């Protein structure tokens, strides 16, 4: 299965999700994208620090979501707003979900941008929990 995680800039939440999923969902192809990403931008230092603390695979550099990404089997967004923006722009293809919604939970993944390293660690724990449920459900 090809899974694409989506956030705003593809430098904080979705790269963390990508790294966790690459470790947990080894039989799947994992990508991350941003709705307003600057192609080639590095992952935030704090996100990278949290990823390295857990010895996870390093994520790819930022890449903006494009029509090609609609070929993913599953597109999982960090917030309901991200989901709504994708559906509004590309239509509802039945494969776009908010991550928490897809695994039977409620709520957005908090954007840690501009926060302390502890905020990034909290985001990591939230994503670890949800992706753990994703693995269990797949």
Swiss-Prot record:
It is an enzyme of class 3 (hydrolase). GO terms for molecular function: protein tyrosine phosphatase activity. Dephosphorylates the phosphotyrosine-containing proteins. It catalyses: O-phospho-L-tyrosyl-[protein] + H2O = L-tyrosyl-[protein] + phosphate. Keywords: Hydrolase, Protein phosphatase. It comes from Staphylococcus haemolyticus (strain JCSC1435). This is Low molecular weight protein-tyrosine-phosphatase PtpB. It comes from the Bacteria. Its EC number is 3.1.3.48. The active site is at residues 7, 13, 111. InterPro entries: LMW_PTPase (IPR050438), Ptyr_pPase (IPR023485), Ptyr_pPase_sf (IPR036196), Tyr_phospatase_low_mol_wt (IPR017867).
């Amino acid at each position: 299965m090809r899974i694409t995680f989506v956030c705003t800039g593809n430098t904080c939440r979705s790269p963390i999700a990508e790294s966790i999923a690459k470790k947990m969902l080894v039989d799947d192809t994992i990508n991350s994208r941003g709705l307003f990403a600057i192609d080639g931008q590095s992952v935030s230092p704090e996100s990278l620090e949290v990823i390295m603390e857990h010895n996870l695979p390093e994520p790819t550099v930022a890449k903006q979501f494009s029509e090609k990404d609609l070929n993913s089997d599953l597109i999982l967004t960090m917030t309901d707003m991200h989901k709504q923006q994708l559906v509004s722009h590309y239509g509802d293809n039945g494969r776009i979900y908010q991550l928490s919604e897809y695994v039977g939970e409620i709520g957005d993944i908090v954007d840690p941008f501009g926060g302390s390293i502890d905020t990034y660690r909290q985001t990591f724990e939230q994503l670890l929990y949800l992706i753990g449920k994703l693995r269990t459900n797949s």
